[in-house]
Amino acid sequence: MSMQDTVGDMLTRIRNAQMANKVSVAMPNSKLRKSIADLLVNEGYVASAVVTEENNNKATLTIVLKYFEGKAVIETIQRFSRPGLRQHRGKDAIPTVKQGMGVAIVSTSQGIMTDRAARAAGIGGEVVAFVA
């Protein structure tokens, strides 16, 4: 059976791994997952994201999680737009997360970017998830 919501699965894997105090989490790779993971690395929520090729041409994305004084750096990570209800917003309607202390991940025509970058570029898109 095929997976319907790959981004939701990715966010759930990260959330579950952090609750279990795991060092890293592995998942099947895709371009969208890799770009979201790179954004999380750039924003400082995870330590690194590496794609490895398996022997049967299946790429695996491994995300190394970040902890500070025994607590996970990511306080909340939640899906906003979902396959059954897509949430598209214009540049003026992109929501802020925790009064600017968190990040909204936005899928735009120019790629995956944060809410701040999308507002600065003057473009809207699909609000994929919230991270704080």
Swiss-Prot record:
Gene3D superfamilies: 3.30.1370.30, 3.30.1490.10. The keyword Calcium does not apply. Transmembrane segments: none annotated. Keywords: Ribonucleoprotein, Ribosomal protein, RNA-binding, rRNA-binding. This is Small ribosomal subunit protein uS8. GO terms for cellular component: ribonucleoprotein complex; ribosome. Belongs to the universal ribosomal protein uS8 family. It comes from the Bacteria. GO terms for biological process: translation. GO terms for molecular function: rRNA binding; structural constituent of ribosome. The lineage of its organism: Bacteria, Pseudomonadati, Pseudomonadota, Gammaproteobacteria, Moraxellales. The keyword Hydrolase does not apply. Part of the 30S ribosomal subunit. Contacts proteins S5 and S12. One of the primary rRNA binding proteins, it binds directly to 16S rRNA central domain where it helps coordinate assembly of the platform of the 30S subunit.
